[in-house]
């Protein structure tokens, strides 16, 4: 038996495509959580790898798209690029949940915070993209950053790029209440570069949330159809390798 890496040419079904976009949201919120809790700008080689891929995708996700033809993998190279998000999403929906009334968050902080941020981003995305002014800000920022990259040797993690992504988040989602309150190293939050990185992470999550909604994603469906979502995640995990 030989395992071959997943081939991008293999099409995903509608639910899998949508689940993968949602995993992108959770990849962003997991990176947000990791950055905030460690209090360090660097989240390791693998963390930076996943973060850079999210930034690339977020700069190419447009306000409108043909949801009949778009695939989440159009914005990534392969399923492995979103493996952190798939694992985070799976952990969040399989962890024991709080017994508190109206609570739909896991008990464990390692799952609770990324899911809390993700749920907030899904709500914020709808408000941001229903406001033409915010949409225009995002489109203008995307064009500006894509041009800037040539000056920074296509370094998506350059402080100036992260600062622009962070400012775009502040100028859009950051203007809407309730704002996302990120928990982490209080001392590190005094560092502008650190907060820029966190806000840049949140911006990529906002963009992935927009793609998810374009693909037919619904917050209510995510909450009340966890079994189907888990099936889709597990199917995507198996698709990372083709067995012959």
Swiss-Prot record:
Stated membrane topology is: Peripheral membrane protein
Q: Name one Pfam family in it.
A: DUF489
Localization? Cytoplasm; Cell inner membrane
Q: Which keywords has UniProt assigned to this entry?
A: Cell inner membrane, Cell membrane, Cytoplasm, Membrane
Query: In the UniProt record, which is one GO cellular component term?
Result: plasma membrane
Similarity comment text for this entry: Belongs to the HflD family.
Q: What is this protein called?
A: High frequency lysogenization protein HflD homolog
Which lineage is the organism of this entry classified under, starting from the top rank?
A: Bacteria, Pseudomonadati, Pseudomonadota, Gammaproteobacteria, Moraxellales
